[in-house]
């Protein structure tokens, strides 16, 4: 069977830059699934994405589906005919579904009986006939949150569509996709190259688009070019470009023909905190800031034009003129804000609502101040500095700078606090209170910052759960999942001696009578333990290991982490599987028994050598392991408990637990309960698979 290259290109208006990659990847994944479901043999499916196009190129696509033999078994002969030999309704319905009559059906005889059978040779459908619907289906499944409709058409897509190119080899596949008749026409760059041209063969793509249309259709190629050219441009001025992955992706999604240029701004603006300048350059203008080797911001920036100009200096000057007013605004806000102390913004917090039922930002500040001080006392941080940081924590939200450049919250609080002469750990805490902001983000660097970050997040968790507005599905408007995971990461990775039970109770207490959910403490703890589950799954721990620890519901995060590591190590031991099975057996035996067990094992009642040996080892280990449990040495404890494998196996091989003798039965059940209690001091090992 011959093979050809297939090309589909959807030419559009400018696509959303932050969604461009996901649209292209989804298009490729959807179309690959369509090919596979149709049984069409194919080679690599390559995706292309530029601001005004999505495209796929499929190598070695078969020209038709393979022929196939199908068999459909019908009713058993006994049910297919009545006593007079006439076909039953079931047989006739089955035959009708196969497109035959009952008398045309074959019979299948096996050692289990005889059935009606339909066999057919189905010729594979041509690829040309299948492709239009496959493309349309793949586009319809794209993850588009908001669809557009344009003109008088009822067609919906992410942006208006102008061209649809469908080529199988050198042949146009006739189809109407998104209201556009397919053709071999491709549009080039808006201002360079040929605005429109035809493509003769799918194999010519994307080279023909580069040569005639001045468009680099390969997303990764554009991104790599921007990165390499920006690094070289920064090197030429003795600096290093801030090429964050997210901004690189966005810029690569904004240009079809990237041309990297270098510009500058007035050095006087460097007196403004670098974070505000960088926010303006990266967030508003999509520029790449440049840093000196010592990490200080240089008065330069790198940007990407979408055109090759005969006079690039004109483009550079234009961008310098655009950014200057924004930097001047930042300078003005910075100087204006410093005319009063950060603390002077406290009264204005009373005018901003945190949440209708939970009060204002000033109310939240008072709670954070108290909770940060309480946490500081628990973890050995400076209580006075923690309460001071709590008092000032939201003051920068009232400054001109943060009002205009919202992403500078926290960091501007730090700069203004330093200007006011606040303690350094207080100033740093104001910046780090929102950390970690995302997975893998840095944690607060000092104890005061840890106390403030935990207090801020716990106040939000307690308040929102306290009024019954916990996250539902994908909706999490107060970012409670991120807050919960942030608290857990700080406590675990900083090894802080905090208990979620008392921490949540204190956060709830500070709300007074504002909360309406009587189960708020348990709800918050359950939610946070659920975040533990997600965290450890991401870390590669097995679900049953997590469940084994969760079964004990440990509320000290650092303790939870120690148990996780202990159980994970226990699973590597030779005795693990046998002891997990034994624990499961013990758990089942105890669950089925309604006996009232004794507080201790009666040694004089023991009879069999195997139960005597096991009972003695349980007693010895109970005393030996008590310090291990107290000190959180769970891994050492489980290693010691692994030594019970042999006596436990011997016990179950030789000893009957549920004997008629009640005293003996209760004594053996008591011994098993004491055995299980030792393991439960760490985790429920019976849940391990």
UniProtKB/Swiss-Prot annotation:
Subcellular location: Cytoplasm
Assembly: Tetramer of two alpha and two beta subunits.
Protein's recorded name: Glycine--tRNA ligase beta subunit
Single GO MF descriptor: glycine-tRNA ligase activity
Family indicated by similarity: Belongs to the class-II aminoacyl-tRNA synthetase family.
Pfam families linked to this entry: DALR_1 (PF05746), tRNA_synt_2f (PF02092)
GO cellular component labels: cytosol; glycine-tRNA ligase complex
Top-rank EC class of the record's enzyme: ligase
Domain of life from the UniProt record: Bacteria
UniProtKB keywords: Aminoacyl-tRNA synthetase, ATP-binding, Cytoplasm, Ligase, Nucleotide-binding, Protein biosynthesis
Family annotation (InterPro entries): DALR_anticod-bd (IPR008909), Gly-tRNA-synth_bsu (IPR015944), Gly-tRNA-synth_heterodimer (IPR006194)
Single biological process term from Gene Ontology: arginyl-tRNA aminoacylation
Reaction(s) catalysed by this chain's protein: tRNA(Gly) + glycine + ATP = glycyl-tRNA(Gly) + AMP + diphosphate
